[in-house]
């Protein structure tokens, strides 16, 4: 470059109106913003995210049609997912071994336990959309590597603030359809023995007929107290037709949901957002997210979960800026 030449940086001032939706989907407010943009941003999607900042929180990230056709490209990294810390064993609503499932996280809101979550990458956790509805992002904290909420002596837990809330745009607060969300951690976590990511399931693969494991800090009985120690329970996963034949109204159970549970073996209040896991060889995959149900362990009312395999493309699209372990 000649000495008298200067590097040209294109500067564009953008003045835009940001429409803020209310809880019922109507426009609640209009905010005017002016942004300065240079040509140093790497692509249009990144540029737009940098401009708006909370656009993911407001719009739920990428919307998608049937089976999430808008496929993204995630970066595969030299790391492993789904590695538990102890051998599998059959349990029923009993405490787990310390950090047996190192991807299990808990969401704390305004200093209090709120929901469960699962670590997907070094800077994203997966949870239920209803868990983050109407929450102020600044008050959300994600705790990883924890086992017993009442003490800090058993495990070196890590706490992270949240920089973005990505809720599925089609989430229906009445039916709980598309009950899925991502939280981006403000600071990535380092993978250790006690903090590791979970594997995503194979798209289109039905886990029906398998035994799943629900992990979380939810109540062990309906109306009971929240436990300090993370719990696990094994539940049979039903087919869609089996679930629709139960006591739920058949139309309430969509293809984006799956059911699991039998008798007293069920997820309960407080488990929301946590994982339903199945083994795949020597690894675990998250096939469901605790979503909704009637009571806890009531006959004829199995727990209902978000079917994660339906959202692989949605997840890939929204995880383009991070590494997904395999």
Could you tell me what each predicted segment is?
Residues 101-103, 115-126, 138, 161-163, ...:
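Extracellular regions of mammalian proteins, primarily the fibronectin type-III
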Residues 76-82, 116, 130-132, 242-244, ...:
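Sequence contexts marking disulfide-bonded cysteines in secreted/extracellular proteins
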Residues 2-121, 125-126, 141, 145-146, ...:
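Protease-domain processing segments flanking chymotrypsin-fold serine proteases, especially trypsin-like
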Residues 130-133, 146-150, 186-191, 218-221, ...:
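Acidic glycine-/aspartate-rich tracts in secreted/extracellular proteins
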Residues 107-110, 120-122, 128-131, 144-147, ...:
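Active-site-proximal beta-strand/loop segments in catalytic clefts of secreted hydrolases
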Residues 2-20, 24-34, 38-41, 50, ...:
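C-terminal subregion of chymotrypsin/trypsin-like serine protease catalytic domains
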């Amino acid at each position: 470059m000649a000495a008298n030449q200067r590097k040209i940086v294109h500067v564009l001032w953008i003045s835009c109106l940001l429409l803020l939706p209310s809880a019922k989907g109507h426009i609640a407010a209009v905010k005017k913003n002016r942004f300065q943009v240079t040509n140093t941003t790497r692509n249009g999607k990144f540029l737009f995210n940098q401009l708006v900042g909370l656009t993911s929180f407001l719009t739920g990230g990428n919307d998608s049609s049937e089976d999430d056709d808008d496929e993204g490209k995630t970066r595969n990294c030299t790391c492993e997912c789904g590695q538990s810390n102890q051998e599998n064993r059959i349990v029923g609503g009993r405490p787990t071994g310390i950090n047996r499932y190192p991807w299990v996280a808990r969401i704390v809101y305004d200093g209090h336990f709120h929901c469960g979550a699962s670590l997907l990458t070094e800077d994203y956790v997966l949870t239920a959309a209803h868990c983050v509805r109407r929450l102020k992002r600044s008050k959300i904290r994600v705790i990883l590597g924890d086992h017993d909420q009442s003490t800090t002596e058993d495990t070196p837990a890590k706490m992270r603030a949240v920089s973005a809330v990505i809720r599925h745009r089609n989430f229906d607060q009445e039916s709980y359809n598309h009950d899925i969300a991502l939280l981006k951690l403000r600071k990535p976590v380092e993978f250790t023995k006690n903090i590791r990511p979970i594997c995503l399931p194979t798209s289109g693969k039905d886990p029906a007929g398998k035994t799943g494991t629900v992990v979380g800090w939810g109540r062990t009985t309906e109306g009971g107290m929240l436990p300090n120690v993370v719990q696990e329970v094994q539940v049979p996963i039903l087919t869609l037709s089996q679930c629709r034949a139960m006591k739920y109204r058949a139309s309430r159970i969509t293809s984006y949901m799956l059911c699991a549970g039998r008798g007293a073996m069920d997820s309960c209040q407080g488990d929301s957002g946590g994982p339903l896991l199945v083994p795949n060889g020597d690894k675990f995959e998250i096939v469901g997210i605790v979503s909704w149900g009637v009571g806890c362990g009531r006959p004829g009312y199995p727990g209902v979960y978000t079917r994660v395999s339906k959202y692989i493309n949605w997840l890939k699209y929204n995880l383009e800026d991070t590494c997904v372990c395999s």
